[in-house]
């Protein structure tokens, strides 16, 4: 999926609002995903998955940091997430559909915290960006 110059600008704009809340939004995204899609819990058998868990907060911060990294390197998402792509494809072997589920949950978190900023145009750009991130993270599965 190709991001237009306008999409890139929109993504950078929304990430400027959310990057200071990385741990909070990342953890909330994971909690929402675990609740809505309980099958995703299977990748975290060693985690305390309860609300407010330190492990969920720490991993949520990593998830948000990866998204911020991708947004900061929006012209080279593949390069920015190369090591993470290798990790998920070769070691963790996460089912690729889970990246889409995570993206949906992230979108909901952004909508909850920044409803006026998530205009239809921004929403479309963020969706394209999250799809691009998911494509990068699954590119080495083939």
Swiss-Prot record:
<dbReference type="GO" id="GO:0005833">
    <property type="term" value="C:hemoglobin complex"/>
</dbReference>
<protein>
    <recommendedName>
        <fullName>Hemoglobin subunit alpha</fullName>
    </recommendedName>
</protein>
<keyword id="KW-0479">Metal-binding</keyword>
<dbReference type="InterPro" id="IPR002339">
    <property type="entry name" value="Hemoglobin_pi"/>
</dbReference>
<dbReference type="GO" id="GO:0004601">
    <property type="term" value="F:peroxidase activity"/>
</dbReference>
<dbReference type="Pfam" id="PF00042">
    <property type="entry name" value="Globin"/>
</dbReference>
<dbReference type="GO" id="GO:0043177">
    <property type="term" value="F:organic acid binding"/>
</dbReference>
<feature type="binding site">
    <location>
        <position position="59"/>
    </location>
    <ligand>
        <name>O2</name>
    </ligand>
</feature>
<keyword id="KW-0408">Iron</keyword>
<dbReference type="InterPro" id="IPR002338">
    <property type="entry name" value="Hemoglobin_a-typ"/>
</dbReference>
<keyword id="KW-0349">Heme</keyword>
<comment type="subunit">
    <text>Heterotetramer of two alpha chains and two beta chains.</text>
</comment>
<dbReference type="InterPro" id="IPR000971">
    <property type="entry name" value="Globin"/>
</dbReference>
<keyword id="KW-0561">Oxygen transport</keyword>
<dbReference type="GO" id="GO:0020037">
    <property type="term" value="F:heme binding"/>
</dbReference>
<dbReference type="GO" id="GO:0042744">
    <property type="term" value="P:hydrogen peroxide catabolic process"/>
</dbReference>
<keyword id="KW-0813">Transport</keyword>
<dbReference type="InterPro" id="IPR009050">
    <property type="entry name" value="Globin-like_sf"/>
</dbReference>
<comment type="function">
    <text>Involved in oxygen transport from the lung to the various peripheral tissues.</text>
</comment>
<dbReference type="GO" id="GO:0072562">
    <property type="term" value="C:blood microparticle"/>
</dbReference>
<dbReference type="GO" id="GO:0031720">
    <property type="term" value="F:haptoglobin binding"/>
</dbReference>
<feature type="domain" description="Globin">
    <location>
        <begin position="2"/>
        <end position="142"/>
    </location>
</feature>
<dbReference type="GO" id="GO:0005506">
    <property type="term" value="F:iron ion binding"/>
</dbReference>
<dbReference type="GO" id="GO:0005344">
    <property type="term" value="F:oxygen carrier activity"/>
</dbReference>
<dbReference type="InterPro" id="IPR012292">
    <property type="entry name" value="Globin/Proto"/>
</dbReference>
<dbReference type="InterPro" id="IPR050056">
    <property type="entry name" value="Hemoglobin_oxygen_transport"/>
</dbReference>
<dbReference type="GO" id="GO:0031838">
    <property type="term" value="C:haptoglobin-hemoglobin complex"/>
</dbReference>
<dbReference type="GO" id="GO:0019825">
    <property type="term" value="F:oxygen binding"/>
</dbReference>
<comment type="similarity">
    <text>Belongs to the globin family.</text>
</comment>
<feature type="binding site" description="proximal binding residue">
    <location>
        <position position="88"/>
    </location>
    <ligand>
        <name>heme b</name>
    </ligand>
</feature>
């Amino acid at each position: 999926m190709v991001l237009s110059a306008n999409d890139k600008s929109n993504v950078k704009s929304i990430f400027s609002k959310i990057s200071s809340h990385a741990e909070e939004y990342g953890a909330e995204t994971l909690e929402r995903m675990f609740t809505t899609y309980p099958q995703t819990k299977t990748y975290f058998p060693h985690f305390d998955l309860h609300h407010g868990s330190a492990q969920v907060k720490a991993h949520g911060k990593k998830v948000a940091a990866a998204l911020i990294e991708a947004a900061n390197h929006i012209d080279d998402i593949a390069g920015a997430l190369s090591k993470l792509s290798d990790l998920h494809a070769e070691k963790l072997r996460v089912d690729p559909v889970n990246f889409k589920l995570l993206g949906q949950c992230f979108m909901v978190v952004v909508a909850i915290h920044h409803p006026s900023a998530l205009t239809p145009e921004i929403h479309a750009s963020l969706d394209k960006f999250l799809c691009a991130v998911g494509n990068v993270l699954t590119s080495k599965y083939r």
